[in-house]
Amino acid sequence: LSSAQVAALTDAQLRAIETADLAAMATAGLAVLATDSISGFSTRQLGALGSDQWQALTTAQVRALTTAQVAGMATEDAAALTTDQLAALSTEQIVALTTAQWAGLDSADIAALGTDQLQAMETRDLAALDSVDLAALSSTQAAALSAAQWRAVETADFGAISTLALAAVSTDAIAGLSTLQLSALGSDQWGALTSDQLRSLTTAQIAGITTEDLGALTTDRS
């Protein structure tokens, strides 16, 4: 079918298309479908799409996906979305992403997310991010995450956070970190903490600081 022919199909006709036939549809044909048509597909139909077909969808089409459709995406299909497509997801769609889908995203995908999208992430999904993903967080993104979200970050990955991002973490979030998370920080990260962040440390957190890390604190912040 040509793009013009595909665009002329009704929603009922599109829903009747067999999965094997939808998988054979040209990317140009998919890109001309109305957003209502996209949201009318079953998760089974969408599951037949290949990575090139997913990437051919416009940002408006991606944003039209229902939360059930988003949650039903295969992990490889979610990972195939472009950074522009991911950045177009609504906060409701972000919440609908499964932990497995989050784990399949790469650092460029994470770096493309807006602060409202990051704030919508479930804590279990933050825990699914690896060290490379966390290293991609900007200072603006780091500042947007809540104390509960930061507490969910795996200790093994915590040391990957850039010094710029760490310096932007809220004082409430710093005070809520576990001693194990803080123990993963390197001397350069300790040295990047602001005076306000250091003052927010609890007595238990301070007691857990190693002498090496104490030595990394600059005189104007210790």
What is the meaning of each model-derived region?
Residues 1-222:
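General marker for long, soluble alpha-helical cores
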